[in-house]
């Protein structure tokens, strides 16, 4: 039986949180399909959501707009629910180049990808948790709307083992091969199995800490045990165990054979169409590529780019929605859309971009028309599949407001009593010199400044100018990858520099209590970067500081500025009245830097003899390393580990393997 959610927190709901929690729960229990939580920056929206999840005790999916915010939410939810299943589901590609064709230059680009094994394991763990238990929170990016293996086929492929079961060794090995596990008697790692006499060791694909030992007596399963794959130490016996497939995309052999016949029929029809239109090159290209794929599927059970035949493999009709993570979520599940003003448009935009690329591939004979059905969900399909939904944002979009029927649940008063920033409007003519003097005031009292510009060129020039005049400044732009971005933000918080200049990156999800001033240059240039929503989000970056202030440089007050200033002042007045009424003195937020960056850091694995006690000492010396330096250190330790293994010095190799595992967790956390 599944456990109930148990919320761990030293804090109790305060400010507007108790009322927001009550209204959200009331709405969900009354069957409302859509609700919007308008929570200002720093008001504890995540804590409110965690309380709702704990009280209603329903499996929950939280959608975040990007991997960085998803990791931050995952870390926070892990802290709130340490005894429950908090899972992480984002794209497992470190690098992904989709298959594409450029007709103008007759260039075909092969699919190329690099898969992050740790994230793949976390994805498998997420779907397993959704299938097995109800106390589950899955934090996902918009990767959740992309095709995933059919849950019905996935369930059918599972291998169920029970103590006393009659099954011979060959049958177990054959079933493991069907689940795409590979036999490796030398290197025991995730997704492999090994055989020693009548003992089969299986390393489940969704696990990174324990493995299963199956002990047979003739054709009977005599014992099932969980053990540590590194030390071989038995932990406990289990009466039954379910081995899940190594990948979400496993398909029974009979389904593959049936799909192959259907692909042959479509190929014949498509060839006739191409020949009728005198497209001889395209017809020859399509025949050659598809026949090769069919031969691979017949021999190996899969082929490169097998996802393009997913319609046949999952038994769907033309145009039907692909199975996604939403198909794994129970009907009474709960969906939380974080930063909904960004996430909702993303969901709507994924389908069309994917479709245009694939239409070119089909037109020029690289793929069959059925490849168009290997796609993300359309927005209307997402709406039909989504369970009861709570949209969470400081600036909800038009869609959320319409769906919620205008009944918005506000969370404006912060538990800390902090007020929204004061806003000043100053002229553009002297904006750079005025900004420089403000920076010097903030730097002198050890506070930080965020500056947002309109263009990349302006950001670069401003950074150079400020640097020449003695300011410690860095520039954040779109070419900087996620790992380096996190490193820059951490350095700002640590005081390595005082000013961070950016364009559109200084908005959602940046949690920096040290920032006391936000400067918005050319605030009167109406447009996407200076819309009401963008201005409120950017102003909100100073809302976590006791002396928070926003300066908008503009020679006139635009409609967006007027609305943003009006809304901020309305919130500030409400917060001030609440504080005065209850005698609350605002308190600054002293959030530890490690709290933000050590996202979802697992507890030490070592609980048995000879394990864990020495590792903490070995890895603490690397805690302060930057992501780049940490990556280099991991590579060095891996090289040493393999050297030890080649010299048959397995104890030293095992110790280094444990260190590498711990450092990888640390690297993922700060990425």
UniProtKB/Swiss-Prot annotation:
The keyword Transcription regulation does not apply. Forms a heterotetramer with UvrA during the search for lesions. Interacts with UvrC in an incision complex. It is found in: Cytoplasm. The lineage of its organism: Bacteria, Pseudomonadati, Pseudomonadota, Gammaproteobacteria, Enterobacterales. It comes from Yersinia pseudotuberculosis serotype O:1b (strain IP 31758). Residues 26-183 form the Helicase ATP-binding domain. One of its GO terms (cellular component) is cytoplasm. Gene3D superfamilies: P-loop containing nucleotide triphosphate hydrolases, UVR domain. The UvrABC repair system catalyzes the recognition and processing of DNA lesions. A damage recognition complex composed of 2 UvrA and 2 UvrB subunits scans DNA for abnormalities. Upon binding of the UvrA(2)B(2) complex to a putative damaged site, the DNA wraps around one UvrB monomer. DNA wrap is dependent on ATP binding by UvrB and probably causes local melting of the DNA helix, facilitating insertion of UvrB beta-hairpin between the DNA strands. Then UvrB probes one DNA strand for the presence of a lesion. This is UvrABC system protein B.
